[in-house]
Regions:
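Boundary at the C-terminal end of the N-terminal hydrophobic targeting segment
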Residues: 34-36
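Pepsin/retropepsin-fold aspartyl endopeptidases
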Residues: 41, 48-332
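Hydrophobic h-region of N-terminal signal peptides that target proteins for export
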Residues: 22-31
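N-terminal non-cleavable signal-anchor helices
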Residues: 10, 25-26, 41, 76
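Generic low-complexity segments that are intrinsically disordered, proline-rich and/or Lys/Arg-biased
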Residues: 8-11, 32, 286
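Bacterial N-terminal signal peptides that target proteins for export
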Residues: 4-20
Length: 332
């Protein structure tokens, strides 16, 4: 009887010890998580003020301070993806979900990163996906029919000047139709007029009982840009009233590492999408979000295409080096 009581007491003691140890661990984690959130908040504030490298340091420090804190990992992942490190950013956001982050919150930020990576299989199966049915169906189709680029190593095409509102215009060949597309930093991908919904050169994805064209996902089966031929290009639609007019975002051009020259009215494109690390010029950090491309300046962060960015660039040629999150501007 005494032996049984001693054994029972020992088991109780062990349970209490384990519970106490768990409380100690939780007590140590909570302050670290709170510290990490403060570092993230400070980093966000610094980033808005244009202090990109100081913000980066704090994002990293928040993750080191609380390695399993989902909010800290999500913040670092979002930052790195915006700076062009798409794959690393995606992995960090996936880890944020693994460590308890809300799948819908993480999915909202992860979906556009998967799209820019061209990882359509991951996009179509994303937990907590924010995508409507049409875009999920498009992602599934693109996962089995991957986009491609064919053409020379590099080529120069005409950049048509415009009065305002865009960075210029280029000619695209969609199917067998030649159209003029304005380069708009606020646009994602290619945006065609709704008249293209009736054309065979654009594949459509829509819910059976949804007649709203705004919810339709499209894929242009072929898009020519000068001597380059792009196949299976994700496409959106807008009611412009003109079949021959379109808009393209810098994310679409980024895959060809474009150099825009407002003086000679030309644009140089590169099939590899890569820029030599030793390329001369002033390097301006950029942040790429679904709402557009932003330039990081000493006095803040400004949208490319806005007045402040136009003042910074002037008429100098510039190259978008999306892989390294920078704009390379020709020296004055």
């Amino acid at each position: 009887m005494i032996r049984w009581m001693n054994h029972n007491a020992l088991r109780t003691t062990r349970r209490l010890t384990m519970a106490a140890a768990g409380l100690v661990v939780l007590a140590s984690i909570a302050p670290r998580s709170a510290d990490a959130q403060r570092y993230v908040a400070r980093a966000d504030s610094l980033l808005r003020r244009g202090r990109v490298f100081a913000a980066e340091t704090l994002y990293y420090y928040a993750v080191r301070r609380a390695p399993r804190d989902p909010a800290a990992r999500l913040a670092l992942g979002r930052y790195l993806a915006a700076r062009g490190a798409l794959r690393i950013g995606a992995v960090l956001m996936e880890e944020a979900r693994f460590f308890g982050g809300d799948p819908k919150t993480v999915g909202t930020y992860l979906a556009p990163v998967y799209a820019r990576l061209g990882d359509y299989k991951a996009l179509s199966s994303l937990p907590g996906s924010p995508l409507p049915y049409a875009q999920r169906a498009r992602a599934e189709w693109l996962g089995a029919n991957l986009p491609s680029v064919e053409g020379p190593d590099s080529a120069t095409i005409t950049l048509y000047p415009v009065d305002s509102g865009s960075l210029g215009e280029i000619e695209l060949v969609v199917g067998s139709d030649t159209i003029r597309a304005a380069i708009d930093p606020r646009v994602q991908g290619i945006s065609l007029d709704t008249a293209w919904l009736r054309r065979k050169s654009v594949k459509q994805f829509a819910a059976t009982f949804d007649n709203d064209w705004r919810n339709v996902g499209g894929v242009a089966l072929s898009v020519g840009v000068g001597p380059f031929m792009l196949t299976n290009v994700p496409t959106g639609f807008s009611a412009t009233g003109d079949l021959k007019r379109a808009k393209v975002g810098l994310d679409f051009l980024a895959q060809l590492a474009p150099t825009l020259n407002p003086v000679t009215h030309t644009m140089t494109l590169r099939k590899s999408g890569r820029i030599d690390r030793t390329a001369p010029g002033e390097r301006i950090p950029t942040l790429s979000y679904p709402g557009g491309l932003w330039l990081v300046q000493r006095d803040g962060v400004w949208p490319l295409g806005g007045t402040m960015a136009a003042t910074t660039l002037g008429t100098r040629p510039f190259t978008l080096n999306a892989r390294r999150g920078e704009l390379i501007v020709e020296s004055r």
